């Protein structure tokens, strides 16, 4: 049997993923894949890296929103682990999963994972900070919006909660210089 790590955020989105957990486990077991679960705890990335090193999974499934994906990507890089990462978007926006066309039918998604289907995506790094990203690198006034919006508003308003918070920050906008290097070119 193949072993995969399931890293899930119990409060992302409407905190509904927990209700679907047994269904997900059963789908993977049909394909002889055992899931070892890890429940995220805010800033517990060091513990997440340790967990991944200890169980040595063949792959990882991140269930949560874009913040969960970000935490898992950074834990993988911190621990120098190079294994496939699957995403089950269960957050408020799930921008990255949506961009990749991941979502909806879990059964066919699990079948693709069991068949070792994957694709490569670019991994960015913020030099000097040692932080990695796969979806968005942002800077400036609007960067904290995702973290500043209270869960109660995200759960009741969804994406609109982010937009409303962003509108409130517009008077504070200002420009600043940025230097970008991509594929070795400035």
What residues fall within each predicted segment?
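Helix N-cap/beta->alpha junction signal
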Residues: 64-65, 138
């Amino acid at each position: 049997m193949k072993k995969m790590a399931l890293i899930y955020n119990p409060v992302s989105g409407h905190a509904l993923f927990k209700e679907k957990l047994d269904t997900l486990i059963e789908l993977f077991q049909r394909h002889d894949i055992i899931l070892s679960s890890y429940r995220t705890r805010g800033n517990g990335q060091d513990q997440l890296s340790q967990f991944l090193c200890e169980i040595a999974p063949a792959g990882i499934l991140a269930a949560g929103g874009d913040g969960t994906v970000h935490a898992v990507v950074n834990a993988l890089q911190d621990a120098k682990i190079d294994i496939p990462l699957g995403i089950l978007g269960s957050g408020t926006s799930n921008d990255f999963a949506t961009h990749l066309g991941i979502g909806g039918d879990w059964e066919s998604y699990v079948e693709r994972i069991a068949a070792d289907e994957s694709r490569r995506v670019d991994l960015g790094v913020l030099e000097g900070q040692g932080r990695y990203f796969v979806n968005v690198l942002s800077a400036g006034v609007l960067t904290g919006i995702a973290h500043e919006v209270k869960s109660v508003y995200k759960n009741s308003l969804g994406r609109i909660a982010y937009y409303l918070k962003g509108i409130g920050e517009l008077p504070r906008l200002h420009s600043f210089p940025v230097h970008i290097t991509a594929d070795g070119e400035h």
